[in-house]
Amino acid sequence: MSNKVHVKKGDTVVLLTGEGKEAGKKGKVLEVNTKDGTVIVEGMNIVKKHQKPRSQYQQGGIINKEAPIHASNVMLVCPKCGKPTKVRRRILENGEKIRECKKCNGTIDVIREAKK
């Protein structure tokens, strides 16, 4: 079962909820997992991972790593108006499928090209 996620890899998002100073921060989406509806955002939800050395070249120790955040806790930032917005998906007359900003009605990107 795949969940629809309103953000894609490379989008800029703002965190809606979080502990302490995390809420309201902006970051870039590094990875989207549609299976469980989570996203990994650059520089947010940092956790410390204790890692054992696996080979003579890999060092062990405590490393900082981004943990997944549920997609409902992030909101897309429109590249046109720069505000956090909801996403509208629309199919144009020529068959092209696009994502639109609900605040400024600007096109965010093309999901599927028009069929020829």
Curated annotation (Swiss-Prot):
GO terms for cellular component: ribonucleoprotein complex; ribosome. GO terms for biological process: translation. Keywords: Ribonucleoprotein, Ribosomal protein, RNA-binding, rRNA-binding. InterPro entries: Rib_uL2_dom2, Ribosomal_uL24, Ribosomal_uL24_KOW, Translation_prot_SH3-like_sf. It comes from the Bacteria. GO terms for molecular function: rRNA binding; structural constituent of ribosome. Belongs to the universal ribosomal protein uL24 family. Part of the 50S ribosomal subunit. One of two assembly initiator proteins, it binds directly to the 5'-end of the 23S rRNA, where it nucleates assembly of the 50S subunit. This is Large ribosomal subunit protein uL24. It comes from Acetivibrio thermocellus (strain ATCC 27405 / DSM 1237 / JCM 9322 / NBRC 103400 / NCIMB 10682 / NRRL B-4536 / VPI 7372) (Clostridium thermocellum).
